[in-house]
């Protein structure tokens, strides 16, 4: 029975977010890197909150005090990650842009070289007048020499044309090779849109939250016997924690998408919504403590309602701003 409980809680908690990861994020290497970065920044924020909890003794006895700082550090690092993301994806050129710039520079240099060769072939105006005077003064005996000179000039033009064709063919081959390389490395060079990028970062934060906050509790379910929630003696503690962790992991994805959209488009009411609901849902978990006035229903039901509302609000805001299809 303990193994069934373990795998049941495991699949309930991580199935939705891992399904989204393998079906959407794992197909693009940049999204995978962003997911790892989201996990790292969330772990750093929790590490700083733990240090803060350790160096201030009064915080060890009051959960509401440490929760406020924990949420605050998470939001600060979310904004720091957004600044890094905006610098790396907006202010820096992509691989395709770099290749296109190099190709354009090669074409410009070839065009300048061609213009310089044409200027060398054209004599000055004074020389043209003197040549015309000499042609008028010359006799018919010089016609053969002029024909020979014209033939030599035509030969030189043919040589120059062949050299230009060789350069064009060389550049075309190089461009074709670059197109083939970009086609093979499409997942590397393709830049995902902002919505997928922010969702990938949120998935990283949610997975890290699930494994850190619920992993140790879930492992205890493999032991003999079972535990019940102090706030609801008839409810299994592992199942209750699994459902709450499921809601929180989904909220991490939604919070990151809304916060990044708010920072990017300067819609700060989205950022305010994220911060307020993050505080509310985190404080609602305190209702699971063993006190006379708490109840697990008062915790899990509001968190579930907030999760459903937040997901709907996130989809509505994305469709309204057309952020799902925008790349830049």
Swiss-Prot record:
The chain crosses the membrane at residues 5-25, 36-56, 62-82, 199-219, 235-255, 270-290, 299-319. InterPro entries: Aph-1. It is a multi-pass membrane protein. Glycans are attached at residues 141, 193. Residues 159-175 have a biased composition (Basic and acidic residues). GO terms for cellular component: endoplasmic reticulum; gamma-secretase complex. Signal peptide: none annotated. Residues 106-175 are annotated as: Disordered. The keyword GTP-binding does not apply. Residues 116-153 have a biased composition (Low complexity). Keywords: Glycoprotein, Membrane, Notch signaling pathway, Transmembrane, Transmembrane helix. Its main location: membrane. Essential subunit of the gamma-secretase complex, an endoprotease complex that catalyzes the intramembrane cleavage of integral proteins such as Notch receptors precursor protein. It probably represents a stabilizing cofactor for the presenilin homodimer that promotes the formation of a stable complex. Component of the gamma-secretase complex, a complex composed of a presenilin homodimer, nicastrin, aph1 and pen2. Belongs to the APH-1 family. This is Gamma-secretase subunit Aph-1. It comes from Dictyostelium discoideum.
């Amino acid at each position: 029975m303990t193994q069934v409980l373990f795998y049941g809680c495991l699949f309930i908690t991580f199935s939705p977010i891992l399904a989204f990861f393998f079906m959407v994020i794992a197909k693009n290497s940049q999204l995978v890197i962003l997911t790892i970065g989201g996990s790292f920044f969330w772990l750093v924020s929790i590490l700083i909150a733990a240090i803060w909890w350790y160096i201030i003794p009064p915080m060890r006895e009051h959960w509401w005090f440490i929760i406020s700082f924990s949420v605050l550090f998470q939001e600060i690092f979310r904004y720091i990650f957004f600044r890094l993301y905006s610098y790396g994806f907006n202010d820096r050129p992509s691989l395709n842009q770099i290749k296109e710039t190099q190709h354009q520079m090669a074409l410009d240099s070839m065009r300048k070289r061609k213009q310089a060769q044409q200027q060398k072939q054209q004599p000055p105006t004074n020389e043209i007048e003197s040549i015309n005077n000499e042609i008028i003064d010359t006799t018919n005996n010089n016609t053969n020499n002029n024909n020979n000179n014209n033939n030599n000039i035509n030969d030189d033009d043919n040589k120059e044309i062949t050299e230009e064709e060789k350069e064009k063919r060389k550049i075309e081959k190089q461009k074709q090779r670059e197109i083939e390389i970009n086609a093979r490395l499409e997942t590397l060079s393709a830049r995902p849109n902002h919505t997928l990028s922010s969702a990938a970062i949120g998935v990283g934060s949610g997975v890290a939250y699930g494994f850190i906050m619920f992993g140790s509790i879930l492992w205890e379910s493999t032991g003999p016997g079972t535990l019940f929630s102090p706030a609801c003696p008839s409810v299994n503690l592992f199942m209750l924690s699994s459902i709450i962790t499921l809601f929180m992991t989904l909220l991490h994805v939604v919070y990151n998408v809304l916060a990044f959209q708010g920072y990017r488009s300067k819609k700060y009411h989205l950022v305010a919504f994220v911060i307020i609901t993050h505080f509310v849902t985190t404080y609602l978990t305190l209702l699971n403590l063993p006190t006379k006035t708490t109840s697990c229903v008062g915790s899990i039901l509001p968190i579930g309602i907030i999760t459903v509302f937040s997901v709907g609000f996130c989809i509505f805001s994305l469709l309204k701003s057309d952020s799902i299809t925008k790349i830049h």
